[in-house]
Regions:
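Small/polar/charged residue-enriched interaction surfaces, especially the RNA/DNA-contacting tracks
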Residues: 1-459
């Protein structure tokens, strides 16, 4: 059957970065990980391959249907595969915008000692939140695709793409489980061109870049299934909090709190490290080595010795993601400190330094957002129960976050929380010294906690 084009669909829109974005190209001369650049000299952009990979990973069935094999492409492990009928353009910054790139520092904490691991200091570039990139997807319906039947199914897949990119948890790039790469689709529009009737309109679109309104299509509603267990909690800072950031001017304090677009933030990297460390401690206490082994499939795992033959050499991606959030109603203030020589009892030479933590100004707000992806009720209840145990420790101030914890910083106090999964939402509120949960909600949370106990007891 001759190859001829029946129709083309075009999806246009803008992807706005809701959190720091890191689509890297490897290490640079000075920075360990640099963002993808190249558009108009030095502006960052999102490669088409990055978006196409995320869309296919999230939407393609396993195994793929016949229509999906045409839409996404399929090698089939042989020469009989088909090329993708979806063309994705590189996502360039919208006209007139200049995305801001900043450098962040990172460390790796040794979970055994609780201090920075040897040679585990690194830095990386990120694109600041607010950057907006233009989206263009083009799907081609060809002659062997069953004409109008598969054209309608192609349109349905594009509607699912829109729904996915507008969802709260949509992310792309590196460190997405640490709060990076959160994106949201805005101003989405869909257009259809049927051939040969719309041939002139199509060439006019290619020439001008502006689609004809008569070819505009309405997005069809898409049914989405909820498969996420999530915790959204609000805390207050008991005293002070600092997540260290290197000084950017000579007269700045030796260490100040991390900021994003000028606002102090609770970074997903810092909070996720604290959550994982406490989860491992709980699992090791109740389940021993087998409890720790179970957490590898929850928090992710990479072989620490590259190239070493192990029983599980394939890296595992974390199912836990934690957002980076803005801290409100706090006051930064410099505090000078000294180091005492333990032998003389006097000030050690050259040991005067200062830091600028955030201090509670009376009604501080620190939000925590934790998600467990691909949640299966019953099977994954024990993971939800473990996360509730960690939430309890955060809530009661037993799990400090950030730096300088040994001098009392980073202690949080729970104010309110919502725990959601499937069609269930449980609200938790702190009223003075009492934690308030309705009877039905308390029963559900106790059931999840019991499932974790059974899982660890079975180890």
């Amino acid at each position: 059957m001759p190859d001829h084009v029946i129709a083309k669909f075009v999806l246009l829109g803008e992807l706005e970065a809701l959190s720091p974005l890191m689509v890297g190209t490897g290490s640079g001369d000075v920075i360990d990980a640099v963002v993808q650049r190249g558009y108009k000299g030095n502006l960052p952009f999102i490669p088409a391959t990055a978006l196409a990979g995320v869309l296919r990973h999230n939407l393609a069935s396993k195994p793929q249907t016949t229509v999906e094999r045409y839409f996404w492409g399929d090698t089939g492990g042989s020469d009989s595969g088909s090329q993708s009928h979806l063309a994705v353009s590189d996502l360039l910054p919208v006209a007139g915008s200049v995305p801001r790139i900043v450098i962040r520092d990172g460390i790796r904490i040794d979970s055994t000692t609780g201090i920075v691991a040897d040679k585990a200091k690194f830095n990386f570039e990120v694109v600041e939140p607010g950057a907006t990139f233009a989206v263009r997807l083009e799907a081609t319906v060809r002659g062997w695709d069953g004409k109008q039947k598969n054209a309608a199914e192609f349109e349905s897949i594009l509607c699912r793409i829109k729904s996915l990119c507008e969802a709260e948890g949509f992310s792309l790039g590196a460190m997405t489980t640490r709060g990076f790469g959160r994106l949201k689709l805005k101003n989405a529009r869909l257009f259809r061109y049927d051939f040969p009737a719309d041939g002139a309109a199509w060439f006019a679109f290619l020439s001008s870049g502006t689609p004809g309104e008569k070819n505009s299509r309405d997005f069809q509603p898409v049914q989405t299934s909820q498969s996420t267990f999530s915790i959204f909690a609000m805390f207050a800072i008991k005293s002070s909090l600092i997540i260290g950031s290197a000084p950017d001017t000579p007269d700045a304090p030796d260490k100040s709190h991390l900021q994003s677009n000028g606002a102090p933030v609770l970074s997903g990297t810092s909070l996720r490290g604290a959550v994982r460390s406490r989860a491992e401690r709980i699992a090791a206490t109740l389940g021993g080595a087998k409890g720790i082994e179970l957490l590898k499939e929850v928090f992710g795992w990479v072989d620490p010795e590259e190239g070493k033959k192990t029983s599980r050499s394939t890296p595992l991606k974390s199912r836990i993601s934690i957002d980076e959030t803005i801290i409100k109603n706090v006051t930064p203030a410099v505090q000078s400190r000294i180091r005492i020589d333990r032998f003389t009892g006097g000030v050690a030479h050259g040991a005067l330094f200062d830091s600028m933590p955030l201090w509670n100004s009376g009604d501080s707000e620190v939000s925590v957002k934790v998600r467990l992806s691909n949640f299966t009720p019953g099977e994954d209840d024990w993971i939800a129960g473990l996360l509730l145990q960690v939430l309890k420790d955060l809530w009661s101030g037993d799990l400090p976050v950030g730096g300088e914890k040994s001098i009392g910083r980073g202690v949080l106090m729970g104010k309110s929380a919502e725990v959601s999964w499937c069609d269930t939402t449980v609200s938790i509120d702190q009223n003075g010294d009492k934690t308030v949960i309705d009877a039905a909600g308390r029963e559900e949370l106790n059931r999840l906690a019991a499932a974790f106990g059974v899982k660890m007891g079975g180890c």
